A protein has these predicted regions:
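Conserved alpha-helical segments that form or flank metal/cofactor-binding pockets of metalloenzymes
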Residues: 41, 47-83, 153
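Charge-rich, acidic-biased intrinsically disordered regions
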Residues: 2, 7-10, 46-47, 51-54, ...
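A structural signal for well-ordered alpha-helices, especially hydrophobic packing surfaces
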Residues: 23, 30, 37, 56, ...
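Helix-loop segments that flank and shape redox-cofactor active sites
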Residues: 7-14, 29-54, 119-131
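Phosphate-binding glycine-rich loops and adjacent basic patches that engage nucleotide phosphates
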Residues: 13-32, 66-84, 99-113, 155
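Metal- and O2-centered redox machinery and metal/ROS homeostasis
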Residues: 1-22, 57, 113-114, 145, ...
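Acidic/histidine-rich alpha-helical segments that form the ligand environment
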Residues: 64, 68-69, 82-138
Length: 155
């Protein structure tokens, strides 16, 4: 006889809410980072331009992992533009040309904010789903590393 392993549905509740919020925050982060990437001006342009692409790639990959985890648990990930705009925990990025120093500071705050939002859910998520908790810990750790690198660039 083969044992069947099932995963409890996460269409509502703590795990689903944590994953959905992480999804919209990570999606907003990668969209804002790409917008800044196109519009930064000033000394240090090239290194920040390249680093923003790293943030874009990392946040996009993390958002995909989060969405796929939510779907695997029976949820329906919602990464639509309207949902991201309405529920993201990030402040909007201003339009137009952006000064390099302001973008370093702004994205240090943004990456730290997304990490903090994820970390705030970890105890509750861990009580229900260790695997999701592990996924979120890895994402938060990477975001904290990026925030540190951005802050260090301002020193």
């Amino acid at each position: 006889m083969t044992a069947t392993v099932t995963t409890a549905p996460a269409t509502t509740g703590t795990v689903a809410k944590a994953l959905q919020q992480a999804l919209v925050d990570l999606t907003d982060l990668h969209l804002q980072a790409k917008q800044a990437h196109w519009n930064i001006k000033g000394e240090g342009f090239r290194s920040l331009h390249l680093f923003l692409d790293e943030i874009v790639d990392s946040a996009r990959e993390a958002a995909d992992e989060v969405a796929e985890r939510l779907a695997a648990l029976g949820g329906a990930p919602d990464g639509r533009a309207a949902t991201v705009a309405a529920t993201s925990g990030l402040n909007a990025l201003e339009g137009g040309a952006l000064a390099v120093a302001d973008v370093y500071a702004g994205f240090a705050e943004r990456t730290a904010r997304v990490a903090a939002g994820i970390k705030a859910t970890l105890d509750a998520v861990d009580a229900e789903d260790h695997l999701t908790n592990d996924l979120l810990i890895g994402i938060a750790s990477e975001l904290e590393k990026q925030a540190w690198m951005l802050r260090a660039s301002l020193a």
